[in-house]
Amino acid sequence: MPDQALQQMLDRSCWVCFATDEDDRTAEWVRPCRCRGSTKWVHQACLQRWVDEKQRGNSTARVACPQCNAEYLIVFPKLGPVVYVLDLADRLISKACPFAAAGIMVGSIYWTAVTYGAVTVMQVVGHKEGLDVMERADPLFLLIGLPTIPVMLILGKMIRWEDYVLRLWRKYSNKLQILNSIFPGIGCPVPRIPAEANPLADHVSATRILCGALVFPTIATIVGKLMFSSVNSNLQRTILGGIAFVAIKGAFKVYFKQQQYLRQAHRKILNYPEQEEA
């Protein structure tokens, strides 16, 4: 048995570089796993390089044998007290950084929403009136109420009320003579019902909803000043401007979608033109 073991050691070959004892007699060998045969032995230096490639800079990552899946037993020299404390601090910081980054991101979004809410209040109510209202309000109410303004605007923008109006239009347009007189042919039956695109599948919808919701107070203020300049109250003028803008924009959108619907319904596929024989 000792002779057989000695013969196996003399015949050992590194499964990384395929070198034998005859190629390098000074190389250090290691048997790190349960493998037998040609994959039993490996150079210490070759295995170290292979482990470095697998760990990719993370010295704490576990590495296993690719053949038998046995985990390599990797040990390090003992650290001194100073190095141990520094290593522990480095690990704690690495684990805490993702949570800190998430907290910073959430905090940035929150204070951006607070700032937007304050600007919106001053824009809708008036600069001086808005500042006076916020100065007299409870700070806790401001910290909770101001960031809800952009949230409510976005949620309100997500309500697709034009689609409900469009369904009612298509359902009762043939019964309302006033619609037929204003829009001739609107209540005529269509040859087929076209397939409509799913609004959730539109990749532009999210950005349009966000931009439209955040710009809405400014548009409502401008429309209110243009159409209801006789109203003295800034708040009432802005509310009326917002209602007018939503109504006018919704009417155009409903009409545009209905015309697209009719265009798709009357779509026709032509015969392929036959080529004249030579």
UniProtKB/Swiss-Prot annotation:
Zn(2+) 2 binds at C33, C35, C65, C68. Pathway: Protein modification; protein ubiquitination. GO terms for biological process: negative regulation of cytoplasmic pattern recognition receptor signaling pathway; positive regulation of cGAS/STING signaling pathway; positive regulation of mitochondrial fission; positive regulation of NLRP3 inflammasome complex assembly; protein autoubiquitination; protein K27-linked ubiquitination; protein K48-linked ubiquitination; protein K63-linked ubiquitination. PROSITE patterns: ZF_RING_CH. It catalyses: S-ubiquitinyl-[E2 ubiquitin-conjugating enzyme]-L-cysteine + [acceptor protein]-L-lysine = [E2 ubiquitin-conjugating enzyme]-L-cysteine + N(6)-ubiquitinyl-[acceptor protein]-L-lysine. Expressed in brain, heart, liver, lung, spleen, stomach, testis, skeletal and muscle. Zn(2+) 1 binds at C14, C17, H43, C46. Autoubiquitinated leading to degradation (short half-life). It is a multi-pass membrane protein. It holds the Pfam family RINGv. It comes from the Eukaryota. It is found in: Mitochondrion outer membrane; Endoplasmic reticulum membrane; Peroxisome membrane. It is an enzyme of class 2 (transferase). A zinc finger (RING-CH-type) spans 6-75. SUPFAM superfamilies: RING/U-box. Monomer and homodimer. Interacts with MFN1, MFN2, DNM1L and FIS1. The RING-CH-type zinc finger domain is required for E3 ligase activity. Mitochondrial E3 ubiquitin-protein ligase that plays a crucial role in the control of mitochondrial morphology by acting as a positive regulator of mitochondrial fission and as an important regulator of immune response. Plays a crucial role in maintaining mitochondrial homeostasis by regulating the dynamics of mitochondria through the ubiquitination of key proteins involved in fission and fusion such as FIS1, DNM1L and MFN1. Acts as a critical determinant of mitotic apoptosis through both MCL1-dependent and -independent pathways. This is E3 ubiquitin-protein ligase MARCHF5. The gene is MARCHF5.
